[in-house]
Amino acid sequence: MLPTLLIVTGARRIEGSSYEAEARVWWTARMLVLAPDVVIYGDASGPDAWGHEFATTRGIPWFRYTKRGTIERHDGAPVRWTDQPPPAHGDNRALWGAWLLHRDRIMVRHAAKRTDRYDVKLVGLMASTPGTGGTIATVNRATALGIPCDVEVF
């Protein structure tokens, strides 16, 4: 049996919402059942931050794909996930949205390349209200690459 590499994704609008507590209970239960050996996630609030907290409090190796173009690692200095610079601080929302979707595609692609060493899975939390579409795009990319996805909508 291969160790589990778990991609965490989710709508940041869940953080601070009226359904955050319910979403977090579901998410924590899924994390405990899936028992990841490695966790990877982005750097948004909400489920991404929960993934970091889950991994660090349990001593699980983690990799955080940041909007600055780096992968922060549990075991060393950050490395770049791209040679391109991120948009400037004041750039428009559409440019940043495209950049973050690109980041999420890279994150999923990196995980998919490790299926020879890991049982790669994804756990995702989606908000029932419209957002940027980043979570569903990440889930769709993972599904297209054959990664099983455990997703719930709140």
Name what the model sees in each region.
Residues L2-F154:
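Acidic/glycine-enriched connector segments
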